[in-house]
């Protein structure tokens, strides 16, 4: 165990012990998300929640509570995973189904075919060096700062030059997961862009065309979505409403406030990989970020 992990565990344990002194959770819902968690991190987090009698909410149950502004008392949690990482099939799904835990997987459509997210190409330094004369903006700008139309032009070139081992689930795997009573597949755009960098045409493609394609794949409605990287603005919220999403999620690090939160700006607290048990739990509960803001 590294010094960093050890110190994080000590701080996390102290934060968890301090939390026991009392916390008003009435009308609050813990909203957490993972990407590609290792089995240990995911299982430790869920076991912690189970031991403390959290009620695990499906996304439909969450929508019903928030849309009706129902009174909520006691511990409630909503769990989601972003991007449909293939590692979820071995590290998450078996545990979820054994323990009957409802989860939502926010799934971008294009990576189901490509096998990886677009950033895989843009973070390949050897590949970028080969293309830097033709696309000098790759050397000057962070990929996420590129307009989506510019990104797409470069991406089409990079995709012809190199392929990678699959990291994201296949269409068939997503279809099979959607048959589980504990797993809901929902929208995460077409290509996982920075939505605030999209023009109106790209926005329609990312939010509406992706929704139609995912619905066709699943044979069922797609009613909810998560903003890639948590980026959104009022124009994107309006587009989600226009394309008949009922609810959308950000990456704002806090609990859901049932009486007041906007259905299209719901927070989620990230549980990243690479940390020890107690730091992971403190991050899941939002205690770590609260400490950093002090």
Regions found by a protein language model. Name each.
Residues 32-35, 75-76, 97-231, 263-266:
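Metal-dependent polysaccharide deacetylase catalytic core of the NodB/CE4 family, i.e.
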Residues 94, 175, 237-238:
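Alpha-helical segments flanking ligand/cofactor-binding loops in enzyme cores
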Residues 89-102, 140-148, 282-294:
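Electropositive, surface-exposed helix/loop patches at the edges of structured domains
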Residues 1-80, 86-87, 179-180, 190, ...:
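C-terminal active-site subregion of NodB/CE4 polysaccharide deacetylases
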């Amino acid at each position: 165990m590294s010094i960093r992990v050890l110190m994080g565990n000590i701080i996390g344990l102290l934060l968890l012990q301090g939390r026991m002194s009392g916390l008003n959770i009435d009308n609050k819902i813990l909203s957490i998300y993972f990407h590609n968690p290792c089995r240990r991190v995911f299982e430790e987090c869920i076991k912690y929640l189970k031991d403390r009698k959290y009620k695990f909410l499906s996304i439909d149950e969450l929508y019903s509570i928030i849309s009706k502004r129902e009174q909520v008392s006691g511990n409630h949690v909503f769990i989601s995973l972003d991007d449909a990482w293939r590692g979820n099939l071995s590290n998450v799904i078996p545990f979820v189904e054994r323990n009957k835990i409802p989860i939502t997987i926010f799934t971008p459509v294009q990576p189901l075919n490509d096998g990886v997210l677009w950033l895989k190409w843009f973070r390949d330094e050897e590949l970028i060096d080969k293309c830097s004369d033709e696309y000098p903006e790759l050397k000057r700008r962070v990929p996420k700062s590129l307009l989506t139309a510019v990104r797409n032009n470069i991406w089409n070139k990079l995709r012809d030059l190199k392929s990678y081992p699959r990291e994201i689930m296949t269409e068939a795997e997503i279809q099979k997961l959607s048959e589980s009573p504990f797993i809901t597949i929902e929208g995460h755009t077409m290509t996982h862009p920075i939505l605030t960098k999209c023009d109106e045409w790209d926005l329609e493609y990312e939010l509406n065309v992706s929704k139609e394609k995912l619905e066709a794949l699943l044979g069922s409605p797609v009613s909810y979505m998560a903003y890639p990287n948590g980026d959104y603005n009022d124009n994107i919220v309006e587009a989600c409403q226009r394309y008949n999403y009922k609810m959308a999620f950000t990456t704002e690090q806090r609990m859901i406030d049932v009486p007041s939160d906007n259905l299209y700006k719901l927070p989620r607290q990230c549980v990243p990989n690479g940390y020890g048990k107690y730091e992971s739990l403190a991050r899941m509960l939002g205690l770590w970020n609260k400490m950093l803001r002090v």
